A protein has these predicted regions:
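Beta-rich, blade/repeat-based domains predominating
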Residues: 57-71, 101-115, 147-169, 200-223, ...
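N-terminal secretory signal peptides and thylakoid transit peptides that target proteins
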Residues: 1-17
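Blade/loop signatures of beta-propeller domains
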Residues: 26-48
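Short loop/turn segments immediately following the C-termini of beta-strands
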Residues: 79-80, 125, 175-176, 229, ...
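Surface-exposed loop and turn segments in beta-propeller and other repeat-based domains
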Residues: 48-57, 140-153, 192-205, 296-317
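Loop/turn-rich, solvent-exposed surfaces of beta-rich toroidal or solenoidal domains
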Residues: 252-302
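Conserved beta-propeller blade signature
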Residues: 74-76, 119-121, 170-171, 223-225, ...
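Blade-level signature of beta-propeller repeat domains, shared across WD40, Kelch, NHL, RCC1
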Residues: 323-354
């Protein structure tokens, strides 16, 4: 049996085993459990039964983001008041949970930066950004930009995400606030900002919603890739804020960019309808781009199509997801998809077939 055939066989067996256990308990099978979604080399089998968390013990509200640590554990940030972070093993079992009292947890980044070990960077919509150890001990908290010279006293501030570069510099996306990307050094000193709010449908370097940010290290020099959710775009910048390029993804209101290998992954939180490209809930899917910024697969969405070099509008195909807020790419190539406003449900695993 070839490695790919073996992988497909194992993925089928794992989802079938989970389903049989559920049926033995007299519970109905979730919709689209075991369905195959995606395109080309990025096809997956849906496993909605991967997570073993007990809602009575480890409840969630919105499952905003997830990252895998170097030792293989999975860290999930939620906005449930009981805890900010749940830590899982790769089989979906909860190992532990902890809280910094954020209550509005939104962004989660794991990074070494210039440190010897990984740290977690937690972002709260209420304005707190905390660097902490992987067991939840605070190490650093960034200053409020209204108190360090970045903003005026009355400027809105509601950060959604941070990215950490190799020198430990922290890049903050103020995605629900004033739409700037703020730069801090590894000690938390404010260095500068770029971006700002735009109301124009095309305005490179300005944002209508700078929802996510990540370091893209696939090229000769690291770049900062930023989500422009409302305009269905990703935009790339130098680390000091010079605009390099952008890509338009019609119909896809994307979440943060996730770089893994040579590809960029993102959850589509809001989607379009045929002939209606407004932001609609319940139309989510996952989108995957190669290193030429071309969409190669849309798990849960329609197959990407280009016409005369231009990407045609992308829509949900099979309603596996409601509102995809993040994608965690595991070391084995599987995906775990986190969702916003989806009935306090846990993340869904997509088991890679090829």
């Amino acid at each position: 049996m070839s490695p790919l055939s073996r992988r497909s066989f194992l993925a089928s067996g794992l989802t079938a085993l989970a389903t049989s256990r559920l049926l033995a308990q007299g519970k109905p099978e979730p919709a689209h459990q075991g369905a195959v979604i995606g395109h080309g080399a990025f096809r997956y089998r849906v496993d909605k039964l991967w997570c073993k968390a007990d809602p009575a013990v480890h409840p969630v509200k919105d499952c905003h983001e997830m990252c895998q640590s170097a030792d293989g554990r999975l860290f999930l940030i939620t906005n449930h008041p009981k805890h900010d972070v749940l830590v899982f093993d790769t089989e979906g079992r909860v190992l532990t949970s902890w809280s910094l009292g954020l209550k509005t947890g939104h962004g989660l980044t794991l990074a070494k930066g210039a440190d010897v070990v990984e740290h977690a960077y937690l972002t709260s919509n209420s304005g707190r950004i905390v660097k902490c150890t992987l067991d939840g001990k605070p190490v650093l908290e960034l200053p409020d930009p209204r108190k360090c010279g970045a903003y005026g006293a009355n400027d809105p501030y509601s950060p959604t995400e941070v990215a950490v570069d190799a020198a430990g510099g922290i890049h903050v996306a103020d995605g629900y606030g004033s739409q700037f990307i703020l730069r801090f050094d590894r000690a938390g000193k404010y260095l500068g900002k770029f971006g700002g709010k735009s109301t124009q449908p095309t305005n490179p370097g300005k944002f209508m919603q700078a929802h996510g940010v990540a370091i893209d290290d696939r090229g000769p020099e690291p770049l900062l890739v930023c989500t422009e959710r409302v305009r269905n775009e990703f935009n790339w910048f130098t680390l000091d804020g010079k605009h390099v390029r952008g890509v338009y993804l019609p119909g896809a209101y994307v979440s943060r960019p996730v770089i893994s290998g040579r590809h960029l992954y993102s959850g589509v939180c809001f989607g379009a309808k045929p002939d209606d490209h407004r932001m609609w809930q319940g139309r989510g899917f996952v989108t995957i781009l190669d290193d030429r910024d071309r969409v190669v697969s849309n798990p849960g969405g329609q197959e990407p199509k280009y016409e005369a070099g231009r990407l045609k509008p992308m829509l949900q195909d099979l309603p596996v997801f409601n509102n995809c807020h993040d994608v965690c790419v595991l070391t084995d190539g599987d995906l775990i998809v986190c969702q916003w406003n989806s009935g306090s449900t846990y993340p869904i695993r997509l088991r890679k077939l090829s």
